[in-house]
Amino acid sequence: MSVMFDPDTAIYPFPPKPTPLSIDEKAYYREKIKRLLKERNAVMVAHYYTDPEIQQLAEETGGCISDSLEMARFGAKHPASTLLVAGVRFMGETAKILSPEKTILMPTLQVECSLDLGCPVEEFNAFYDAHPDRTVVVYANTSAAVKARADWVVTSSIAVELIDHLDSLGEKIIWAPDKHLGRYVQKQTGGDILCWQGACIVHDEFKTQALTRLQEEYPDAAILVHPESPQAIVDMADAVGSTSQLIAAAKALPHQRLIVATDRGIFYKMQQAVPDKELLEAPTAGEGATCRSCAHCPWMAMNDLQAIAEALEQEGSNHEVHVDERLRERALVPLNRMLDFAATLRG
């Protein structure tokens, strides 16, 4: 595997944490959101990494809690005229690309993703142009502009299957932006992959030594790992997979104690799936090290109840997602390829 462009994730400024709400304030905003969703003919689409109270509200209002692939499917098929996307910006853009006729709202448009930030379109275009013989596969965690230059978009839930398919056709791959997921896929498939060097600030922080000590403390625990984690962490796993695949693994494994190496937002749905099992966070700091994300995406944390209520009430430029139509049409092609390929896997 060849590598290039190594963005420094340490330079990304973290957003300020939302001001904590009182119990009464939370109750007020919950009821307000429920009312506004009905008035606006809107539905919530929330990612597994949002805070538990956001996921709970999506459940209670007939919305969706899922990984980015299922979020895309759900939003495109749901009859609501407005989608409230609780996640990060590329998820809102993806919803708009797939459903241009719908109003796409987000609690704030400043919800970034370190993978997206680490793959600026100008640098990506230069890399793309330097390797015209390669099929371009980009992770869903990219901007609409980067998706528009791709042949395929992929999520972690189908990454191995797609690259295995393309490799069987003799295609050489450009992979962007996550280096850890790219290396995992390359190891699983043996594909010829030229890999961008981005990383998720959450998964990149998991520490091998600290995880080993936790494993020694709980030798009966299984380790579940998202493939955006470093290879040394992946090598310790009893199960590796996307968010939805990790929840399925938690149910399938016989272990009563699980160490989970992904954003702790997943614990809400995972604990529902395995109410009798104990879930432990994989450590993100160790031996003189400190964590920046501490196993929770700081941009996902910006999706709070007050911001959601304001998005539904105010609309406008601070909350509504727009994608240039020409860009949208180009990005739609690889997104539809992803959805069609995923449909063949589901049978």
Curated annotation (Swiss-Prot):
This is Quinolinate synthase. Its EC number is 2.5.1.72. GO terms for molecular function: 4 iron, 4 sulfur cluster binding; metal ion binding; quinolinate synthetase A activity. It holds the Pfam family NadA. Binds 1 [4Fe-4S] cluster per subunit. It is an enzyme of class 2 (transferase). NCBIfam families: nadA, PRK09375.1-1, PRK09375.1-2. Gene3D superfamilies: NadA-like. Catalyzes the condensation of iminoaspartate with dihydroxyacetone phosphate to form quinolinate. The keyword Plastid does not apply. GO terms for biological process: 'de novo' NAD biosynthetic process from L-aspartate. Its cofactor is [4Fe-4S] cluster. Belongs to the quinolinate synthase family. Type 1 subfamily. It comes from Shigella flexneri. InterPro entries: NadA, NadA_sf, Quinolinate_synth_A_type1. Its main location: cytoplasm. [4Fe-4S] cluster binds at C113, C200, C297. One of its GO terms (cellular component) is cytosol.
